[in-house]
């Protein structure tokens, strides 16, 4: 709707200087996702070329794969667009074929839906993990959809591309791994007899996801660092690749749990400010006046995180989101009157 990045949106809520903290936080999250996907790439290459020697071993492949993925992010939005034209149709076809093979191989829908995983999760833990898997992308959504021609196109792209298509791909992955009993997707694809083509498409899926992760991380950092976006892409990409090659993907579930609780309060504060306090009226460009730091926004965000991690009833993601919205609304309507808690002022030039 606003046509700006998440970091720009945060300027109105957290302040001109405060938004830099949010930019760094989101950059760390997306760089972390980059590292995780680099690890998955290494696993896929190892499964694809088990006799390829050290060059296709999991951690070495993760390193050179991360460097290659950095190229399209370096090219910017044009690079993302070119790769997506190739990858998206291939991923859709693989998902449909994978679901059909999984269902048929398991004896039908009833049989596959009755499969019990070796380590089942509780409903609340599952929801937190799901929110964690979506939270990073949701936070970065405006970084991608800001190029949409209007608000309607942005919403349609988000609903169909992210909520519907992405959910179907995740469901397809679950059905394939459930049908084979393999938790590692590359191994599961091979176990189902989908072959090398499936692994190549899986690599494309990882690539298209990861160049977006690095692109978004660079946008977040460019909001607060005096360097060009290209330099930030290279430095962030190399550091995230090293972390990924060291095995961050081995802690994937823990990573999702952290994101599922920590990111919703950031969104909660921005949503509350935009819809409930500012009436969906944000201004940008020369002459726009921002506060430097909105202390109430940070207190609400941190309060939501604390509640999400410490309150053990209900669903942690919803608890942290709701707490941040309520806290921010109450603080701004009471203590926030008369610019209390609003530190400094800065005019956009």
Regions found by a protein language model. Give the residues of each.
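Transmembrane alpha-helical segments of multi-pass small-molecule transport proteins
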Residues: 23-26, 50-75, 89-98, 122-138, ...
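Hydrophobic, membrane-embedded alpha-helices of multi-pass small-molecule transporters
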Residues: 102-105, 114-176, 190-211, 291-304
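Hydrophobic transmembrane alpha-helices that form the core helical bundles
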Residues: 19-53, 207-223
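Hydrophobic alpha-helical segments and their helix-loop junctions in multi-pass secondary transporters
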Residues: 73, 89-116, 126, 130-134, ...
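Membrane-interface loop-to-helix entry segments
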Residues: 60, 64-65, 69-102, 117, ...
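C-terminal membrane-solvent junction of multi-pass transporters and transport-like membrane proteins
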Residues: 267-349
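Juxtamembrane transmembrane-helix boundary signature
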Residues: 1-13, 23-29, 333-341, 345
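Membrane-water interface regions at transmembrane-helix termini and the short interhelical loops
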Residues: 43-52, 65-87, 143-149, 216, ...
């Amino acid at each position: 709707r606003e046509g700006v990045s998440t970091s720009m949106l945060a300027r109105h809520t957290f302040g001109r200087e405060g938004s830099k903290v949010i930019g760094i936080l989101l950059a760390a999250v997306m760089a972390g996702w980059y590292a995780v996907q680099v690890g998955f790439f290494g696993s896929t290459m190892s499964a694809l070329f088990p006799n390829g020697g050290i060059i296709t071993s999991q951690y070495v492949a993760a390193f050179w794969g991360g460097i290659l993925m950095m190229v399209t992010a370096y090219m910017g939005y044009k690079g993302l667009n070119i790769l997506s034209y190739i990858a998206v149709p291939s991923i859709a076809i693989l998902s449909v074929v994978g679901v059909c093979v999984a269902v048929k191989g398991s004896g039908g829908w009833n049989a596959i839906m009755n499969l019990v995983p070796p380590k089942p999760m509780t409903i609340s833990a599952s929801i937190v993990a799901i929110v964690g898997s979506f939270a990073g992308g949701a936070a970065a959504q405006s970084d991608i959809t800001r190029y949409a021609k209007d608000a309607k196109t942005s919403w349609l792209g988000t609903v169909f591309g992210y909520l519907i298509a992405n959910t179907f791909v995740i469901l397809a992955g679950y059905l394939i791994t459930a049908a084979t009993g393999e938790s590692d997707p590359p191994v599961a694809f091979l176990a189902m007899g989908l072959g090398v083509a499936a692994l190549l498409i899986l690599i494309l899926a990882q690539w298209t996801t990861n160049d977006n992760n690095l692109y978004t991380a660079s946008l977040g950092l460019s909001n607060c660092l005096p360097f060009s976006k290209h330099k930030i892409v290279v430095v962030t990409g190399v550091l995230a690749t090293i972390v990924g090659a060291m095995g961050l993907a081995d802690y994937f579930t823990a990573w999702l749990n952290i994101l599922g609780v920590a990111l919703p309060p950031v969104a909660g504060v921005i949503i509350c400010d935009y819809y409930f306090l500012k009436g969906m009226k944000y201004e940008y460009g020369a002459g726009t006046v921002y506060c430097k730091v909105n202390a109430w926004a940070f207190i609400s965000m941190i309060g939501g995180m604390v509640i999400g991690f410490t309150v053990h009833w209900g669903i942690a993601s919803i608890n942290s989101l709701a707490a941040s919205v309520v806290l921010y609304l109450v603080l701004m309507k009471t203590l926030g009157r008369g610019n209390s808690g609003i530190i400094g002022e800065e005019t956009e030039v």
